[in-house]
Amino acid sequence: MVDVASVRQHVGTKPHRAPQMIDFDNKGFFKLKQNDEYAERVKSLLLDGEQVIDAYKSMRDGVVFTTKRIIAVNVQGITGSKKDFTSLPYKNIVAYSVETSGTFDLDSELEIYFSSLGKVRFEFTGRTSMVEVSKHISRHLF
């Protein structure tokens, strides 16, 4: 799941038709499952020296953790050929929280607080290990 308490502004868009960007205000849940499909989809967006740490997919959307940022992918339209890629740089993270899976609750959660953006929350299915992602976020905080 992804949710944030603020609204992104659309710069340079036509007033009668705003682009369909990721809705960080939507409180709806979607569960992310580890999947390399989105790692391939964002390769052309990666900077020199930037590498994929892990990639996750929900029903249509995806999230990719790289060495420099989080890239959220919003698949749009009936055919899914149109996509919005939102870059969330680690350098803007002020705090984060990880909830690991338990004995009966197999899901885990990652809440990240971005300066001037608010909270972004990701929910993962199964026994997803957040160790590498957590370590990488911590490296950018300290």
Model segments located where?
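Anionic N-terminal interaction surfaces
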Residues: 7, 11-63, 119, 127-132, ...
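Charged, low-complexity, helix/coiled-coil-prone segments
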Residues: 28-42, 71-85, 139
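Short, intrinsically disordered, mixed-charge
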Residues: 47, 95-98, 138-142
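Phosphoinositide-binding peripheral membrane targeting modules
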Residues: 51-62, 66-107
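Canonical pleckstrin homology
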Residues: 99-127
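C-terminal output/interaction extensions
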Residues: 133-137
